[in-house]
Regions:
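A short, internal acetyl-CoA/4′-phosphopantetheine-binding micro-motif in the GNAT/acyltransferase core
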Residues: 65-72, 100
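Conserved catalytic-core motifs of GNAT/GCN5-like acyltransferases
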Residues: 96-98, 110, 115-126
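Conserved GNAT acetyl-CoA-binding A-motif
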Residues: 88-101
Length: 126
């Protein structure tokens, strides 16, 4: 049974999962405490995580979404995004996501309803 639930304390216990999306712990630290974290588990086994931050009034950003490699391409990431969009729909008019240029990630987000907006220089450095 799939369950998605928020994590309020000890978010760093999922550092191995978070580092699948962002290898630099210092970057994770920048958003982890101010963000809301969700874990997706299936049959009591953690499969995926995401962290959402409020960037401005009504503007939120998916800072991190990660699925353990052995569980990828099984719909867990898509379910987590669908949950997040539903969870924030009443307080969010814009949901952002920043990602690399991987040939898999942009089409994935587009298939989840996101529209490509622009390419930012040094996005992962600033």
């Amino acid at each position: 049974m799939i369950r998605i639930h928020p994590i309020s304390g000890n978010k760093k216990q999922y550092l191995d999962l978070l580092q699948l999306a962002d290898e630099q712990e210092s970057m994770i630290d920048r958003y982890l405490e101010r963000g809301e974290m969700f874990i997706l588990s299936d049959n009591d086994t953690v499969k995926a995580s995401c962290v959402i931050t409020c960037e401005d009034k009504g503007i939120y950003e998916i800072k991190s979404i990660a699925v353990y490699p052995e569980y990828q391409r099984q719909g867990y990431g898509r379910q987590l995004i669908a949950f997040v969009l539903e969870h924030y729909k009443d307080r969010c008019h814009t949901m952002l996501v920043g990602t690399g240029d991987s040939p898999l990630t942009i089409p994935f987000y587009e298939s989840c309803g996101f529209a490509y907006s622009h390419r930012g220089p040094d996005f992962f450095i600033d």
